[in-house]
Amino acid sequence: MEINRGIIMEMAHKMVVKKMKKILNKIGLTKSILRDWRKIAWTQLLWRAKGRKSALLSVVPYKGTCIDCHSSAQIDGSGVLCLNKSWTKSNPFKTLLVLNRNAHLQIEGNVDIYGDSTIYVNENATLIFRGGYMNNRLNISVFDRVEIGRKVYVSENVSIRDSDNHTLMYDGKTSTNISAPIVIEDNVWIGMNVTILKGVHIGTGAVIAAGAVVTKDVPAGCLAAGVPAKVIRENISWS
């Protein structure tokens, strides 16, 4: 008897969705909007922590999370990404995660992202989390590559953008380097209302003061402040 593979896949998908809803209810999470996840390997999203004492989801969408994921997008890594966490029992905020065609989200450490945040990983772009904590109103937009290291602590209302999104014409010339990768190394503290722009490399142990606009590299162990941000102290540490 010939087996219709399409029917089997449809049945398997429905079973996984049903199981996922039960899991989310058990751990206190309500329904999130999940679109077009059918062709993504569910083992990348559910129970990849097999064998650990407590099996975890790779992506944990708390109440109010909206995930829009293209079927060709890839999610991998050994960590756990929690979206739209809240300081209070009732959470009035929403958080949006968008993974476009061939986008790559790599989760290598445990990451908590709080409410009212937006994360876009655009076509063929890569976002890497290695662990940390990011407060409300985080805005990450990736057109090339953004890498965020371990123990990175981000305050409220921070924007990280690796692209200008538009070309700039002046003196008969046209800008060509619209996008450039951003690297934030380990143990970095980013203050509230900070903007980090394309091509920036922030070294290990650096601190970015509140309100700074970072357009150039910040060396390891330095404090940068201002618009545009400049190094104002060296050989610092923080806890």
Language model: regions and residue ranges:
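Short, flexible, glycine-rich and Lys/Arg-enriched loop motifs at helix boundaries
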Residues: K89-K94, H166-T174
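Conserved catalytic-core motifs of eukaryotic protein kinase domains, centered on the activation segment
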Residues: D164, D171-G172, V200, N235
